[in-house]
Amino acid sequence: MNEILVVTVNEVANARIARVVGPVYGTSIRSRTIVGNMLGGIRAIFGGSQEGYIAMVNQTRDEAIAALKAHAASLGANAVIGMRFDSGEFDAGQGQAMNEVTAYGTAVILEAVM
C-alpha cells in the first residue's frame, strides 16, 4: 500500500484535487487496566501530569489515524484532507472507563502540479 498523506488543511501545496472520494474515518477505543486507573487516581490527588493517560490517548490517536489511512486506501484515495479528531470517554461497566478517538476527513486523489 502506498503511503496515504493526511493533512489538517483543505489544500496541499504543489498538488490539485483530481477527485473527491468522500468522507473517511478511523476509530480506536482503549482502556487502562484497573491497576492503571487506580494509580492514576492516586496521582490525581496530588496533581501533576498523568503520563499513563497521555501515553494511552496518544496511542489511541495513532491507531485512529492508521485506521483512517486504511479506510482511505480501501477507497482508492491517496490523501485525506481536513483531518480532525473527535474523542470521548464512556463507562464500560464496573467503573472501567473507555477512551474513544475518531479521526475523520475527506479522502481525495491528489495529482502533482508542475
UniProtKB/Swiss-Prot annotation:
Domain of life: Bacteria
SUPFAM superfamilies: YbjQ-like
Protein's UniProt name: UPF0145 protein Acry_1752
Pfam families linked to this entry: YbjQ_1
Coiled-coil portions: none
InterPro entries per UniProt: UPF0145_dom_sf, UPF0145_YbjQ-like
Family (UniProt): Belongs to the UPF0145 family.
